[in-house]
Amino acid sequence: MGVTLMKVERPKGTRDFTPEEMRARRWLERYLLDVFRSYGYEEVLTPTFEHAKLFEEKSGEEILEEMYVFKDKKGRKLALRPEMTAPVVRFYNAELKTRPHPLKLAYIVNCFRYEQPQRGRWREFWQAGVEVFGSDRPEADVEVIELTYRIFDGILPSGAFEVRVGHLGILRGLLEEYGIGEDVQNKVAHLVDKGELDEVKTLLPAEPAEKALAVVTARSESEVEEAVSGKERAERALENLMEISDALREAGVDHELDFSVARGLDYYTGMVFEIHVPELGGGSQCAGGGRYDDLVKELGGPDVPAVGMAIGFDRLLLAAELYDRIPDGVEETRALLIPLVRSGKIWEIAAKLRKLGWVVNVEVSGKHIRKALSLADSLEYDYAVIVGERELKEGYVSVKNLKTGVQEEVPLDQLERAAEV
């Protein structure tokens, strides 16, 4: 009986990354983590899967429909994480709530949603973000937006991205004054987030629908003031937004007020913001976040205010590629070590060169020297280090500079001279 060969392809909506792509991804990871650390944020990591109920209460209808949900062998309902805020809050409630506050956390992780794959949208994707626990002051909101702005400003050219800042407390406060419950508020926010404003009229009575639409289509502070006049909670939310906006302008953060920013998650309660890169087209939103003062308590923890944001890692990388902002690579000396003899000394020589800061790739397939040198050229290496029986016996290596063609003998006890060839 013949053997049946099986062709296995990667799942739809996932990707394989080449070495060149991984260099770019690691570059962006290092950049983001350096910025996070410079602001005092400490990196955390949570499990790739959680109990599904963690997301079922507060993540919103759209995410619920897109979650990867399964049961384990004991029948427990689990889900691959579709986003990271809820897991970080769960972790905070379990182990971190006794730490000094405000507590500033950061992460870069993969998430999963069953979406229709397209440019900038995958079923496995990466998020980078921060969360601040323990401050209800506008300074915390300002820092989260300002930090995100600096990240984009440090990578993309001036004018390549837009910062839009809004406040869900205005819409929620307005609807609350009309006796509209949280469930309907969430539905309205989802409709606004998707731009389906006509549907709002079918969901709400005439007057609150008119006022809500006046808020989310407003183009100025005065238009919102008129729409929420006499609605105390909404007025306070507008004041909070203007305080945040004024501080952002003083901090040099170019932004626009956008009262239609609603986000797609049910847990947002106050300030919300998004960053868009218009040149990316339909998938232009690259970051977003906001305040979620009730989520910690709703997930079984203390009454602790919080604010955070998440960056679409893959989309930011796309934007960096679009504007040719990804560095070619770090400056390093790279060599192919070509052994012409079998000896454990080969690994000792390679180790010594690595200690000098070289990247040393040992040729392990036994290629003829001509083919090995051709390989080194194709890899665009700087040097070939040739080790044969005579070299080992006399205590030296032959070092060939692949850029100049110069080849010299370098004593084993003076390998630091190899870079001078």
UniProtKB/Swiss-Prot annotation:
Its main location: cytoplasm. CDD domains: HisRS-like_core. It is found in: Cytoplasm. GO terms for biological process: histidyl-tRNA aminoacylation; L-histidine biosynthetic process. Gene3D superfamilies: Anticodon-binding domain, Bira Bifunctional Protein, Domain 2. GO terms for molecular function: ATP binding; histidine-tRNA ligase activity. Keywords: Aminoacyl-tRNA synthetase, ATP-binding, Cytoplasm, Ligase, Nucleotide-binding, Protein biosynthesis. It comes from the Archaea. The keyword Ligase applies. One of its GO terms (cellular component) is cytoplasm. Pfam families: HGTP_anticodon, tRNA-synt_His. It catalyses: tRNA(His) + L-histidine + ATP = L-histidyl-tRNA(His) + AMP + diphosphate + H(+). Belongs to the class-II aminoacyl-tRNA synthetase family. This is Histidine--tRNA ligase. It comes from Methanopyrus kandleri (strain AV19 / DSM 6324 / JCM 9639 / NBRC 100938).
